[in-house]
């Protein structure tokens, strides 16, 4: 007669077989994530393909070390063990390790972190800072022994000698590298004299470059008040640090060139151009004023200076007439005032007082006449002197006295200096002018 087993007995037997079977102690599965809903601690979901579904469990400690976020429909490769749950008689896979199928976990983590930080605005162009044209000090966050720092020093020294490089020796890969990079970026920002900051390292695998994809590094770059140039890996490598930096350089040499956009030779050439422009401007200005001076010397005032006084002579005549008119008016007013006083005196009547006042009035009248005559004579003499002074400047008066005025090319000649034999001169005389040719020049020592 057959022996019937209880459900629990069979379940325990199957569990023992699962646990002792070497093929089930460590299984390698590939499948698509299904029914995933993230929970605070342990994660429970399904792994399926076209024909079957298996329940899987990831304990919280393992899930936190995955390095990427599980998503519904994601195809993953897992390593785990089979476990049977006795109360329900169901089995599941306890995952010990997982990674995306076809693409590494780091690549998934890269895209997920890129999306997260991008949505926060860390990569937007509006936050990018411009690089200085003439830096005095350049900070470098990199390994002290790699080729990066040597290339940067060589390039900067060649392009603009005298620029100081401040090195922050930094671990650029492995555990703790991201934290040290971020710390040194913040340390550099404590200085007020750094103009630009270069962070970078040489080429390597995605694992080697991963410190520059860490969130801590990216946020430190974004928060830097000093403009940051990222130079990580080779030209084909791209890190999140490149997106957050103000500028990205393909090589350390290119980073040094970005940090020194103007070379010493460029600056010297620019200064030479400015000097040439200034020289041309000064030369043009001198030519302009020289031309103006030539025009002035050919003007009527210089060729006929007597015209300069015509207006003044006319004004002097007008002033003379006004002066005479004022004297006459003043004399008439005073005379009228005296008459008024005489009438008042006559109206007061004692005779003696009237007589005394009449005498005083007569004396004042004589004094007034005398003063008016003196004033008039003085003004007339002053006008005469001014007229004679102006007449002395009149060339027609000079030639009227028997002198001649010598001109060369319509310019008055005051000395024999500058006169050579066969020069043609013009002699202005009282009744005409003579055109003469110099036959001999005899100069006197003065």
From Swiss-Prot:
List, in alphabetical order, the GO biological process terms annotated in this UniProt record: DNA catabolic process
Q: Which reaction does it catalyse?
A: Exonucleolytic cleavage in either 5'- to 3'- or 3'- to 5'-direction to yield nucleoside 5'-phosphates
Compartments in which it is found? Cytoplasm
The name under which this protein is listed is: Exodeoxyribonuclease 7 large subunit
Principal location listed in the UniProt entry: cytoplasm
Family in the record? Belongs to the XseA family.
What gene is it encoded by?
A: xseA
Q: What is its EC number?
A: 3.1.11.6
Keyword annotations for this protein, in alphabetical order, are: Cytoplasm, Exonuclease, Hydrolase, Nuclease
- Give an example GO molecular function: nucleic acid binding
Q: Which residues form the signal peptide?
A: none
Which Gene Ontology CC terms are recorded? cytoplasm; exodeoxyribonuclease VII complex
Q: Which HAMAP family match?
A: Exonuc_7_L (MF_00378)
